[in-house]
Amino acid sequence: MEKIIVRGGKQLNGSVKMEGAKNAVLPVIAATLLASKGTSVLKNVPNLSDVFTINEVLKYLNADVSFVNDEVTVDATGEITSDAPFEYVRKMRASIVVMGPLLARTGSARVALPGGCAIGSRPVDLHLKGFEAMGAIVKIENGYIEATAEKLVGAKVYLDFPSVGATQNIMMAATLAEGTTVIENVAREPEIVDLANFLNQMGARVIGAGTEVIRIEGVKELTATEHSIIPDRIEAGTFMIAAAITGGNVLIEDAVPEHISSLIAKLEEMGVQIIEEENGIRVIGPDKLKAVDVKTMPHPGFPTDMQSQMMVIQMLSEGTSIMTETVFENRFMHVEEMRRMNADMKIEGHSVIISGPAKLQGAEVAATDLRAAAALILAGLVADGYTQVTELKYLDRGYNNFHGKLQALGADVERVDDSKIDVTNLASLF
C-alpha cells in the first residue's frame, strides 16, 4: 500500500502549472459518443485514474480510444453498444454521463447505478426526469438504469436543483433530439460551458451555457472535432491554499480567476494577497490569517469541491470559523481525521465550527474521499512532525503527481510503498 508522508514546516515558493479539469474532461469524453463522423481529438487531458475509467467505459461501448501524453482520441463511428457495466461504473459515479449520449445516439442506454466517492446520496433522479420529459421510458432494475426511446423529442425541463451531472446529461441527449429543449435552473459551472463549447464545435446548437437557462436546438448528426480542456479550477484552488497556509509566494499557472472568484474573495478576506498575472494567479501568504465563515453553494457560489481544503486554512486562522455544506450531505467524514492532527472542530448539523489557530501535529490519517485526500496533505504541510496519508486511490482520481508538484515548490513530501519504509525513522526519507 502506498502512502504520502509529509514533513511540515516548509514554505512553498515558485510556480506550478495546472492540468486540464477533471470535472470538464469526463463529460467531454462521454460526448464524443455523439459523433457519428470523424475522430475526436481532446488536448490538455489530465493523467488521472478517472480518465482511464471513462476511457475503458467507451472502449466497452465499442469506441476506439487512445490516451497518449495529454491527448485522448476517440473514434465512435462504429456500431456503438448501449450497455455500460457495473465493473466500470462502480469506480466512478461520473460514468453516468454516458447515458445521455447513448440514449441520443442509439435510442437506448443501460447503465449501472454509479459509485465513486461516498458523499451522500447524490441521486440520479434529475437525470432521469429530463430523459422522460424528452420521451424516454426509464426503469431501474437489478442495479441498472435502463432508458429507451424510439426518438427523443425536445421538451421543457426544470431542474429542482442545479445539478452539474444532470445538466450535462440532459444537454447531451438533447443535441440529437427532434425540436427544441429548454432546461431551466441549470448548473452554471465553467465545466458546463466547456462541454457546451465542445458540443457546438461538433455542430450542436447549444445556447445559454453559463446562465440559468440552456436552450438546445436538436440537429440530425454531430461530427468529431478537436478541443482543449479548460484548466482545473479545483486543482488551482488547492495549490492557492497550499501557498497561503505556508506563507509562501506561488504562481498558479493557467488558473482562470473568473472560474474561482468566490475562493479568491474569501482568501482575500482572510488576508491572503492575490495578484492576477498574465499567465495565472500569484498567491502570497500572510503572517496571520483572519477567520471567515464559508457556505458551499452551486456556482458561482463557493465550490463544494474546495470545502475540505478551505477548512485547513480556516483552522489555521485566528478566531472561530464556520463551514456550512449545502450541496452534499455527509461530506464531513474528513473532520475526524483532522481532529487526529489536533484540529479543534465540532460538527453541528450541516456546519462545522472551527476554532483556531490550531497547532497541528503530524499523525497517520486516512483519506475519506478525493478532496479530503488533498486537504489532509495540505494540513501536513503546516503540522509539526510527520503526517502519513493513506488511501491514495482517492487522490489519484483527481490529482496527477500531487506530491511531485509540492516537492517542486519546496515541500518535504514523499510518496512511498508502505512495506519498504522504516516508520520509526521517517527522517531518512528527506
UniProtKB/Swiss-Prot annotation:
Q: Which organism is it from?
A: Listeria innocua serovar 6a (strain ATCC BAA-680 / CLIP 11262)
List residues binding UDP-N-acetyl-alpha-D-glucosamine.
93, 122-126, 305, 327
Its Gene Ontology cellular component terms are: cytoplasm
Tell me the keywords, alphabetical order.
Answer: Cell cycle, Cell division, Cell shape, Cell wall biogenesis/degradation, Cytoplasm, Peptidoglycan synthesis, Pyruvate, Transferase
Q: Does the keyword Iron apply?
A: no
Q: What role is this protein assigned? A: Cell wall formation. Adds enolpyruvyl to UDP-N-acetylglucosamine.
Q: What is its EC number?
A: 2.5.1.7
Residues modified to 2-(S-cysteinyl)pyruvic acid O-phosphothioketal: 117
Protein name as it appears in the record: UDP-N-acetylglucosamine 1-carboxyvinyltransferase 1
What protein family does this chain belong to?
Belongs to the EPSP synthase family. MurA subfamily.
Q: Where is the active site?
A: 117 (proton donor)
